[in-house]
Structure formats: structure tokens, C-alpha cells
């Protein structure tokens, strides 16, 4: 039977990872290793300055752990190299995240980082995120569409094989719409996210300042010379976006021009 490792950045008790497990439990043997607490926007952080403690969850056949103060990358690394080191995983899936992970947000994302860690460890990996109608994660939300999309995608992987070679992963974003309103999937590049220099300053009861970051609305623009719809465009039209991501961040187009710019300094 196929074996899938699940993680997330919203925490072990989050609704999204429970919905993900429910969607896949009849398709494969499911293992879950997730942070004990929310670790959103922690990116590829791994813990090397403090010990990690893994708590085995009772009643889950020894296949569920939550990691005290662990990040998604910690969880995947620990699962593959120690907790389940004798298990050969067919897939690592990170999600279902509460909120989008599109454009440059993928650099910040703990959800995407979980899938990146799976890729680094040599396991085909997928990150999946559910768009929210607002910033309130307690807003009632159906995962029916996200569950259907991940079921279809996993079945395709099991039938045809993983579609990417090398250190690459799939990043999936699901629109906030009903099954009836859904328009299908689109293969997309990352869009160009627009960020505002926005910091929310507050004062606590002791008259000390504190700050909230990252509360600006989702805005984007088209990349130059890009004919394809981006992940943002797909979501805006009630399509799911499926974006291949590459771990190689080298800007190959700039190597020769950089050599010319640096000419005379190279020894």
C-alpha cells in the first residue's frame, strides 16, 4: 500500500490537516507529523539551537506525532530520518493551509517549506492551500473542493507517476468557491505579489509598543512578457492553480552579464 506523510504549518490540531487526512485515508497509509503550535510564515526554518521533543499521539497506530515547538521542515526531516526511518514514503503533502500561498508568499510559507523539505529528502512533494474569504481563520469553511482536488491529484501521481524530476515540487492553491462554481485546474507560473510597507503599531497596558506585520490585502500584477495566467489570475477566476516550483534559485539568465560586470575583479 502507498504511504503518505502529512505535515502543515497551522499546527497538529488544525482543521486543514484533518480534512487532508480524511481525503486520503482510503487511498494510502497515512502518517502525520505536525507542529504542536501554529508556525505560519516560518519559511524553511529548522531547529538547530534547541532540542526537539516528539509526542506520539495515542490511538493512531503509532503513525501520528506532534513536535513541540517544531517547524514544518523539522517535522518532515524528523519523520523521514528518525520517527519513520524504516518507511519508504511515496509522497509528502503539506496542508491544507488556511490561506493562500501564491507569488512571493511561497518564500515565507511554512506550508510550502514542508513540501520543500520533503523534496530535499528525496520524496515527491505537494503543498496545498485553501483561499480564505477574509483573514479570520475561525470563519466557517468547507474543504470539500480542496479534498476533491488533492484526491484527484494524488490518484494521478499514483497512476502516472510524479510529473516533476529533480528538486522540484507542486504548489496547489484552491479557490474559495463551491463545487458548482469551480472552473477546474490551471497550470500556472507564480504571480508577482505586491507588498505594502505596512506595520500595525499597538500599545500594551504597560504602555510598551508592539507590532503586527503582514496584514496587508492580497494584490498582484502581471509579470513582464508573461502570457500565461498566474496563480493569482487562476484563483480570481475560480480555478485552482497548480504551480511547479524549483529549489534551484540561481538566476541563470544573469550569469554571463554578471561575469561582464565583474570582469577585472575575478582572479
UniProtKB/Swiss-Prot annotation:
- Positions with a binding annotation for a divalent metal cation: 9-10, 40, 97
One of its Pfam families is SurE
- Which InterPro entries does the entry mention? SurE, SurE-like_Pase/nucleotidase, SurE-like_sf
Q: Which UniProt keywords are listed?
A: Cytoplasm, Hydrolase, Metal-binding, Nucleotide-binding
Query: Which GO MF terms does the UniProt record name?
Result: 3'-nucleotidase activity; 5'-nucleotidase activity; exopolyphosphatase activity; metal ion binding; nucleotide binding
- Disulphide bonds in the chain: none
Asked if the record carries the keyword Nucleotide-binding, the reply is yes
Gene Ontology cellular-component terms listed: cytoplasm
Keyword Heme among record annotations: no
Q: What is its EC number?
A: 3.1.3.5
Where does this polypeptide localize?
Cytoplasm
| Catalytic activity annotation | a ribonucleoside 5'-phosphate + H2O = a ribonucleoside + phosphate
Q: How is the cofactor bound?
A: Binds 1 divalent metal cation per subunit.
Q: Which cofactor does it need?
A: a divalent metal cation
What general EC class does the enzyme of this chain belong to?
hydrolase
Query: What is the recorded function of this protein according to its Swiss-Prot or TrEMBL entry?
Result: Nucleotidase that shows phosphatase activity on nucleoside 5'-monophosphates.
What HAMAP family does its record include? Answer: SurE
Record's NCBIfam families? PRK00346.1-4, PRK00346.2-4, surE
What does the similarity note say?
Answer: Belongs to the SurE nucleotidase family.
Q: What is this protein called?
A: 5'-nucleotidase SurE
| Species of the source | Helicobacter pylori (strain J99 / ATCC 700824) (Campylobacter pylori J99)
